[in-house]
Curated annotation (Swiss-Prot):
GO cellular component assignments: late endosome membrane; lysosomal membrane; nucleoplasm; phagocytic vesicle membrane; plasma membrane
Cellular localisation: Late endosome membrane; Lysosome membrane; Cytoplasmic vesicle, Phagosome membrane; Cell membrane
Reactions that this protein is recorded to catalyse: a 1,2-diacyl-sn-glycero-3-phospho-(1D-myo-inositol-4,5-bisphosphate) + H2O = a 1,2-diacyl-sn-glycero-3-phospho-(1D-myo-inositol-5-phosphate) + phosphate
Keyword Disulfide bond: no
SUBUNIT field: Interacts (via transmembrane domain) with ATP6V0D1. Interacts with LAMTOR1. Interacts with RRAGA and RRAGC.
Record-given protein name: Type 1 phosphatidylinositol 4,5-bisphosphate 4-phosphatase
Gene: PIP4P1
Membrane topology: Multi-pass membrane protein
Function: Catalyzes the hydrolysis of phosphatidylinositol-4,5-bisphosphate (PtdIns-4,5-P2) to phosphatidylinositol-4-phosphate (PtdIns-4-P). Does not hydrolyze phosphatidylinositol 3,4,5-trisphosphate, phosphatidylinositol 3,4-bisphosphate, inositol 3,5-bisphosphate, inositol 3,4-bisphosphate, phosphatidylinositol 5-monophosphate, phosphatidylinositol 4-monophosphate and phosphatidylinositol 3-monophosphate. Regulates lysosomal positioning by recruiting JIP4 to lysosomal membranes, thus inducing retrograde transport of lysosomes along microtubules.
One Gene Ontology molecular-function label: phosphatidylinositol-4,5-bisphosphate 4-phosphatase activity
Modified sites of kind Phosphoserine: S162
Segments of this protein annotated with the region Disordered: 1-74
Length: 277
């Protein structure tokens, strides 16, 4: 009895002869071992696996499945693809053809798929940021906080001259703050207000000297007139009080003219530097 138990197989024999049971043995239902007993053996190839449907290639048991790819098969030809201008990856533009640019899913940078709008152009910053600006722009700044690079686009192709005339004038040095500014009013009244200190000065000495002499002579004449009027009407002033008012009026005019002459004499003078055209 013990010998029969030792010779019994480790796996029970299949009920149906070998294809569908849990215990599988070699062909013919048994395999002869070295000691005359039965030993388990591998099933025939394909006996334990259901057949694949027709039209699909079989995958071997030890073979890995093909890698997953989100891209559409080239055989379908339904999804339009473009190449990223930064990392050269493929970008699916299906449903995005109405846009001017698309974003790459690998490098997160924009790539144009259409021409820029009329009057605009695309510029790629060295940090790979895609910018859009006017065709006539010569300098643009990158908006990214960590870049802020100023990009010089260079001169644009020649076109018609600008209808706005170039500023014509003289560069002068302010007599107050010594800063340089442009003076464009070519008139006899050579007064100019400095845009830096907002103070008025004269361009050259000719105009304030002329005004100073005129005001001084007029004030001197009024002073002489007031003196003569006072001596000539001294006796009548005691009788007519209005004569005192005439004296005061003439004296006031003389003082104003002499004060104006002093103002022109003390005015700061701004000196021209060079012509500007």
């Amino acid at each position: 009895m013990a010998a029969d138990g030792e010779r019994s197989p480790l796996l029970s024999e299949p009920i149906d002869g070998g294809a569908g049971g849990n215990g599988l043995v070699g062909p013919g239902g048994s395999g002869a071992g070295p000691g005359g007993g039965l030993t388990p053996s591998a099933p025939p190839y394909g006996a334990a696996f259901p057949p694949f449907p027709e039209g699909h290639p079989a995958v071997l048991p030890g073979e890995d499945p093909p890698p997953y790819s989100p891209l559409t098969s080239p055989d379908s030809g339904s999804a339009p693809m473009i190449t990223c201008r930064v990392c050269q990856s493929l970008i699916n533009v299906e449903g995005k053809m109405h846009q001017h640019v698309v974003k790459c899913g690998v490098c997160n940078e924009a790539t144009p798929i259409k021409n820029a709008p009329p009057g605009k152009k695309y510029v790629r910053c060295p940090c790979n940021c895609l910018l859009i600006c006017k065709v006539t722009s010569q300098r643009i700044a990158c908006p990214r906080p960590y870049c802020k690079r100023i990009i010089n686009l260079g001169p644009v192709h020649p076109g018609p001259l600008s209808p706005e005339p170039q500023p014509m004038g003289v560069r002068v040095i302010c007599g107050h703050c010594k800063n340089t500014f442009l003076w464009t009013e070519f008139t006899d009244r050579t007064l100019a207000r400095c845009p830096h200190c907002r103070k008025v000065s004269s361009i050259g000495r000719r105009y304030p000297r002329k005004r100073c002499i005129c005001c001084f002579l007029l004030g001197l004449l009024l002073a002489v007139t007031a003196t003569g009027l006072a001596f000539g009407t001294w006796k009548h002033a005691r009788r007519y009080g209005g004569i005192y008012a005439a004296w005061a009026f003439v004296i006031l005019l003389a003082v104003l003219c002499l004060g104006r002459a002093l103002y022109w004499a003390c005015m700061k003078v701004s000196h021209p530097v060079q012509n500007f055209s």
